[in-house]
Amino acid sequence: MNKTPPETRTGEIAASPARFLGRGDAAVFDTFVVPQYLALFAERLLELIVPTEDARVCHLQCRTGYPDRDLLARLPNAHVYGCDNSEFAIELARAKAKTIAGFVHDYRVIEAFTTPFPPGAFSHGITLHPLAAPAERRRMLEELARIVAPRGQALVAMPLRGSFIEIADLLRECALKNELTELTNAVEAAVQLRPTDELFKRELEEVGFEFVDVDVRTRTLRFENGRQLFEDPATRLMLLPEFRVNLHMPDDAPFAYVREAIDKYWSDGAFELTVNVGVVTGRRKSA
């Protein structure tokens, strides 16, 4: 596992290896991860955005700026402010934004969720695929509550509980066969980190939003074999780093078991990975 670079060590969330995106990674992320994986979360989020004239949108954890181009189709003339911990992702987001005629944008590098914006500055606040850890979600939702204006809209899309259950099952099998009690406990704890739809709804309500609803749609990712799964850019840049953090896994031996098991059990067909795509939306309560 790559050592976390010094520039990402400020603040607990920013220091997570699951948040790091280097220069080369940012380009791969935008070229492959966005259309093949992140689009699963953006497509429904965009449909649920409430149109507003002269919208001001804050995109927390914006990475390389997706889906800000598509956002303009839903919110013409919107001003978009994107924030992320990766300077390389922000660099690419800025370059892409300059190719869109008339697009008013401001992309900034931030630490954790500390945005420089005043309270109530935005009509909309959005986030795609935040980390599963409850502390991460809480800080992100609290920041959305701070910067979204009364009656403004927040939208957050992420994998809900039950996502990636096939990998969890194979890790459980690995733990059972090798009598790894710590791994069994780690898998069970990691599975519980992701919210259910009811918990997701309650969390947004608790920070000051009303008319909250959660849209859930099940999608599948198909892989021909274990190698394709583990070499896929979405797995490498998004899923595995977070799995390692959530499982507190000291080495990758259990993942090697998963890869071999996929090749064994699914030798005659594709391996399908479940993703429960959840989008929570709500309106900021009036003061």
Report the location of each language-model feature:
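A short SAM/SAH-binding and catalytic strip from SAM-dependent methyltransferases
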Residues: 123-138, 158
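N-terminal, positively charged/glycine-rich alpha-helical extensions of SAM-dependent methyltransferases
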Residues: 1-27
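Helix-to-beta-strand junctions that scaffold the AdoMet/dcAdoMet cofactor pocket
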Residues: 134-135, 148-150
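Conserved catalytic/acceptor-binding region of the Class I
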Residues: 138, 151-224
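A short acidic, Gly/Pro-enriched loop at the edge of an enzyme's catalytic core
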Residues: 113-125
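Class I SAM-dependent methyltransferase SAM/SAH-binding core
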Residues: 56-115, 139
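C-terminal helical/coil "lid" or tail adjacent to the Rossmann-like core of SAM-dependent
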Residues: 213-268
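Conserved alpha-helix/loop element of class I SAM-dependent methyltransferases that forms part
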Residues: 35-55, 70
